[in-house]
Amino acid sequence: MILFPAIDLKNGQCVRLEQGDMARATVFNLDPAAQAKSFADQGFDYLHVVDLDGAFAGKPMNAQAVEAMLKVVKMPVQLGGGIRDLKTVEAWLNKGITRVIIGTAAVRDPELVKTAAKAFPGRVAVGLDARDGKVAVEGWAETSEVTALDIAKRFEDAGVAAIIFTDIARDGLLKGLNLDATIALGDAVSIPVIASGGLASIEDVKAMLTPRARKLEGAIAGRALYDGRLDPAEALALIRAARKAGA
C-alpha cells in the first residue's frame, strides 16, 4: 500500500476544500514547495498533487507552483487538474511528473486516455470522482450520467496505470474512506485503484491493510495530515511493517 500525501493548489497556495467546493477552501501553506519538502522529509514516497484552478479552467493554472515542487523533492509525483490534451500530458511528463491524472477528459474524450496510455506506458492514470454514484466533471461542478464502473470498464485494456476513485461527499470532511465502494470498484476491474476522499485517522490506514483491501494500490491523505489527526510516522511505520509481512 502507498499512502499519498495530497497537495491541492489554488492561486499558487496549498489548500484543502470541503466536498470540492472552491468557496470552502482553507489555506494550509502559502508555499507548496515547502509543503512538498515537508512531506518528503516525513518519509512519504509518492506525492499526489491537484491543480484545482486547472480543473475548472481546463488547462494548467498552477504550473509555477508544481515546477517549484519538482525542484525540491526526489520522490515520484502524480498530478491532476486541467490535463485535457496530449500536448499537456507530454509537457508535464517531460517536466518531471511521474504520472498524470486525467479526469474530465476521461469522460468527455476517452480516446485521449487510450492514446496517452499507449504513448506513455505506466504514466497515465484516470481520476474518477463520484457524487451519488455518478462521475462528476469540470472540477466537480457538473455531474454526468455515467458511473465510475462504467468509465473504468472503458479503460480495462488501455494500459491505464491506476484509477484514483474519490467519494466527493466525504472529501475534506474527515468522515473516513468509502472503502466499500472503492473495494467494489477495485474488484470489478484489473486496473489498480487508489482510495480518495475522507481519510480521517490511523483507523483508515489500518482498514487499507486488511485482506479485503489488498488489491487497492493505496490511499490519498489530505486534511487528516494538515489537521494533525494522522501521525505520518505512525501511519508509515504500519505500512512498512505490512509490506515486510507481504501485505
UniProtKB/Swiss-Prot annotation:
It catalyses: 1-(5-phospho-beta-D-ribosyl)-5-[(5-phospho-beta-D-ribosylamino)methylideneamino]imidazole-4-carboxamide = 5-[(5-phospho-1-deoxy-D-ribulos-1-ylimino)methylamino]-1-(5-phospho-beta-D-ribosyl)imidazole-4-carboxamide. The active site is at D8 (proton acceptor), D129 (proton donor). SUPFAM superfamilies: Ribulose-phoshate binding barrel. Its EC number is 5.3.1.16. It comes from Bradyrhizobium sp. (strain BTAi1 / ATCC BAA-1182). The lineage of its organism: Bacteria, Pseudomonadati, Pseudomonadota, Alphaproteobacteria, Hyphomicrobiales. NCBIfam families: 1-(5-phosphoribosyl)-5-[(5-phosphoribosylamino)methylideneamino]imidazole-4-carboxamide isomerase (TIGR00007), PRK13585.1 (NF010112). GO terms for biological process: L-histidine biosynthetic process; L-tryptophan biosynthetic process. It is found in: Cytoplasm. Pfam families: His_biosynth. This is 1-(5-phosphoribosyl)-5-[(5-phosphoribosylamino)methylideneamino] imidazole-4-carboxamide isomerase. Belongs to the HisA/HisF family. The gene is hisA. Keywords: Amino-acid biosynthesis, Cytoplasm, Histidine biosynthesis, Isomerase. GO terms for molecular function: 1-(5-phosphoribosyl)-5-[(5-phosphoribosylamino)methylideneamino]imidazole-4-carboxamide isomerase activity. InterPro entries: Aldolase_TIM, His_biosynth, HisA_bact_arch, Isoase_HisA-like, Isoase_HisA-like_bact, RibuloseP-bd_barrel. GO terms for cellular component: cytoplasm. Pathway: Amino-acid biosynthesis; L-histidine biosynthesis; L-histidine from 5-phospho-alpha-D-ribose 1-diphosphate: step 4/9. It is an enzyme of class 5 (isomerase).
